[in-house]
Amino acid sequence: MKILAIDTSSKLCSVAILEDTNLIKKLELNNGLTHSETLMPLIQKLLKECNLTLNDINLLVSDIGPGSFTGIRIGVASCKAFSDSLNIPCVGISSLEALAYNIKNDGIICSTIDCKNNNCYFALYQLNSGIYNVLHEHCAMSASDVVTLLNTKYPNKTINFVGDGIPSASSNEYLNVENLGIAGYKKFINNNYISENILPLYLKKPQAQIQLEAKLKEKI
């Protein structure tokens, strides 16, 4: 099965083609342009370098967030458009779940993504023999609250941190589009997806909206 994975959740635009869980090739680009300008040319370049066309793709996987609000919308919309026009399945994977796949050792995985002002997007997973089970659903909370939660619920456990939400504790900080594809493939073969239901995952309001609401409150 040939898989096209798309990640536009950060400044980096990343695409990859996999054969099941094996990477064929990936391309990443951060040239200062918007994802709406770079995504399609990057996909076309990737397909050409792999001697493939979109008709050869059997499964689409998109990062649904959390992350860049605009970037996520572009990636999800593109994935759904390909899915509808080519009649192939589309799987959505959260950034936090894809990050967890950076860790290969069994144990508890804390995935975090910085969302400014000492806050982070957060989710907790248990990896056991290649299976990633959710211990705590994705949410937005302060970095200090994440640490408190972990110390309270798992005081004697080793925690594997991944992502940039808690800089002092994190490693393997960046989402790998290859892992995004692998996570999507696993959901597909377990029939744990609904193509029509793929939607952006927003865990908090955009910063601009938060600032605007704060200014409006000051005027009241």
Predicted region positions:
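Surface "functional belts" at beta-alpha junctions
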Residues: N22, N31-T34, P89-N176, Y202, ...
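Residues at secondary-structure transition points
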Residues: N30-T38, F69, R73, A77, ...
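Phosphate-handling active-site elements
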Residues: E49-N55, D84-I93
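DPxDG-like acidic metal-binding loop motif
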Residues: L59-C90
